[in-house]
Amino acid sequence: MKKLIIIFTILFSVNAVFGQSLKSVKLDSLVNVSLPSSYTKKDTLGQQVYTANSDLGYMIAIRQANEKGNQPLQKENDLNAVLKKYIDGIQSQSGNGSAQNIRDTTIGTLKAKAFTLFQNDPNGESQYRNFILLYTQDATYTFEYGYGDSRKDLIKGESKAYFASIKLSRELQRNDQYVDTRPQTSNSKVTVIEITGGILIIGLIAWLIFRKKDSGQFA
C-alpha cells in the first residue's frame, strides 16, 4: 500500500511540474500549441520544427508550408487522401513502424487524423509515437508525442494535455481545408432513395395499366 502511495505521489508531482512549465507557442498566426518552456526550434526551408522533452516522453510540433500555387482540395475525400499520404510517408520513413488506430478527429472546426505509430524493437524497448495531422490550404501541421513501452500506462495524462493544448484561430474554417463543405451523402442512403424511387415508378405504371384495363371492361 505504501508503494502505491509513493508511486501516485511521484506521478502527481511529475504531472504538476509538467503543467506548470508549459508555455504556449505560436507555430504561426493561426495555430498555437503548449510545450515545456525548454523547447528548441529549428527553421529550415519553410519548415519549423519545435521539440521538447518531459520526464515521461517527448513532444514535436511541425509546421510545413505547402507548395505555393497548391490547388485547393475540392471535397472531404480529397482531404482524406492527402492525410493518408502523410500517414503512409511517416510509416515508410520509420523503417519498421506500423500505423495503428487511424481515426478521424476534429480540432476546432477543422478535420484531422489521429494515429499511433508502433515501432517494435526485439533487442530493446519498443516505441510508441502518437500523432495528430492537420492540413490547411497554406500549411500542414504535425503534432507528435513519443514514449517508450515501459511508460505507456503513465503518459496518458501528459499526452492528452499536449494534444488538447492545440488551439486554432477563429479565422480557420473548414473551407480552408477543402472547397465543398456540404455534408456528403453516403452511398447507402443514395441506394435506398434510388430503390424507393424505382418501386414507386413501377407501382405507378402498374396502377395505370390496371386502371386502363378496368376502364375498357366498363366501356
Name each model-derived stretch.
Residues L4-V14:
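Sec-dependent N-terminal signal peptides
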Residues D28-L30, S37-Y39, Y141-P183:
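Surface-exposed amphipathic alpha-helical segments
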Residues Q177-A219:
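C-terminal single-pass membrane-anchor helix
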